[in-house]
Amino acid sequence: MKNTSDYGVLMMNLGTPDAPQTPEVRRYLREFLSDSRVVDLNPLIWKPILNLIILTIRPPKVAKIYQQVWMDEGSPLLVLSERLKEKVKEALSEKKGQTVPVELAMTYGNPSVEVAANKLREQGVKNIIVIPMYPQFSATTTAAAYDRLMKSLKNCPHWPSLQLLHDYADHPMYIKALSNSVRAQWDKQGERRHLVLSYHGIPKRYVTNGDPYARRCETTSRLVAEELELGDHEWTHVYQSRFGREEWLKPYADATLKALPSMGVKKINIISPAFSIDCIETLEEVTLELGDEFKNNGGLAFDYIPALNDTPDQVALYVNLIEQNSKQWT
């Protein structure tokens, strides 16, 4: 197969510690929480809190959580992202009849953006399609990925041409893929259940200041509900992962799941559309913490619907996104 593709692809996800141990988790959290896109507080206030309190208390606790979900091959986020990358590369190369360079990078941690970008350069890539693996745009995720990419190219003598994907919150193939996952779960369990769509939260202040994330999440939920022909009483939209005392996007997932049984909703399925790949937030927070919250307050059945991961639907979606963004080079 020829290696003369007109472009290469850089897939970017958030990041993960190198190991489920306290030192590695502390190193990762320091990099992640030092990004002003993630925490935009005055550094004179935030840095002492981060270094003296959070990075002292949180790493041992978070390391134990990672140990519960760690796979034999490594971090679930990295392992599953790599699997998706390889399948996307194979599918793209087969369609084009030539090898298409595809690399994976993490905004924080490894593989770094610098390493991934260098690999593309070494393969002679002059045009790069950048695919942040976040279905709903947010400055805290997608823009942070762009920042890291631009920083990595700062000292590059010859910049490649870049095509940056904004998001795909309303892409028909994405909505269809999520809906297919829900239908498959319903078939497996032999019944339709109330569907909870849970998204990673961000401070409400960010949205007030212009971040479109909440609107994009709401769009995804509405389209999935329409695709599944759900009535308003058959689905619920929530936000998880609240941190600190500041008000975040509502409704809060934990409070909502605690209340649902008293409203007559005893059986639910929950899906997290904002996560293209399963990770600590889905495998531990959703599956275990939110599941316990629901069942401890009268819920009878709780089943998490996995992220799209490296499924054929997600591979086809990413191939389509790449093809749509490569037209000027093909």
From Swiss-Prot:
Keyword Acyltransferase appears in the UniProt entry: no
Record key words, sorted: Cytoplasm, Heme biosynthesis, Iron, Lyase, Metal-binding, Porphyrin biosynthesis
Biochemical pathway: Porphyrin-containing compound metabolism; protoheme biosynthesis; protoheme from protoporphyrin-IX: step 1/1
GO cellular component: cytoplasm
UniProt GO MF annotations: ferrochelatase activity; metal ion binding
Superkingdom, natural source: Bacteria
CDD domains listed in its UniProt record: Ferrochelatase_C (cd00419), Ferrochelatase_N (cd03411)
UniProt binding sites for Fe cation: 200, 281
Protein role: Catalyzes the ferrous insertion into protoporphyrin IX.
Sequence similarity: Belongs to the ferrochelatase family.
Family matches, as NCBIfam families: hemH
HAMAP family per record: Ferrochelatase (MF_00323)
Protein name: Ferrochelatase
UniProt source species: Marinomonas sp. (strain MWYL1)
